[in-house]
Structure formats: C-alpha cells, structure tokens
Amino acid sequence: DSYNEIAKETSVGDLNSSKISLHTVGSIDDNEFEKIYNETKNSVFKDSTLEKAIINKKLSCAQCLKLMSLYTFDNDKLKMLQVLKDHIADTTNYDNIVNSLDFISSKNKAKEILGIP
C-alpha cells in the first residue's frame, strides 16, 4: 500500500535504453505506472478508468503530466487533474503541472485545484 510504505529510493532509469524514470520517492514504480497509463490510454472513459486504477496509490508530478498528456485541450487536462490531485506524492513539483498548461486561465484553475495560493 503506497500510502504506508517507507520512502523508496528514486529510480534513475535504465541508462542503456535511455528510458527516463518518472518515479519519485513515495510514488508507484514505473512498471505499475505504465500499466495504469496504458489502461487509461486505451479506455473510452479515461477519467473513470484512472480513478479506479489509482485508489490507494500515489503518483509523481511527472507521472501525472504523462497522464494529462493523453488529452490535447487544457479543459480535459484539468478534469484529469481533478482526479489526480489527491494522489500526488511530490507536491513540491506542482509548478511543473501548472506550467504545462497553455493558458493563464487554465494555470489559475490548476492552482485552484491543487490548493496553491
């Protein structure tokens, strides 16, 4: 159970394949994330699929950004952020999520969702 785990070592990725790890201390590992990502990507109802898949799990901001990138438009990304907000392990990286959005109004909405003043 990710909530109760002692902080894990941050993965630096497989240098041979130049795959960058999206894992951070306290978040699910890359393999588990890829499973959730693919399930969500292949689902017609992405938000509800994701909501079920991340029960009792924490994600890194990088993992959240990858999931949000399944959508093109900020409004859809913000809906996904609403699902993800209580599952973010590295809250110090919220700015990465906010800055990924295209419009100032979307950035402000993301701050509101994340509880950033």
Regions found by a protein language model. Name each.
Residues 1-117:
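General marker for long, soluble alpha-helical cores
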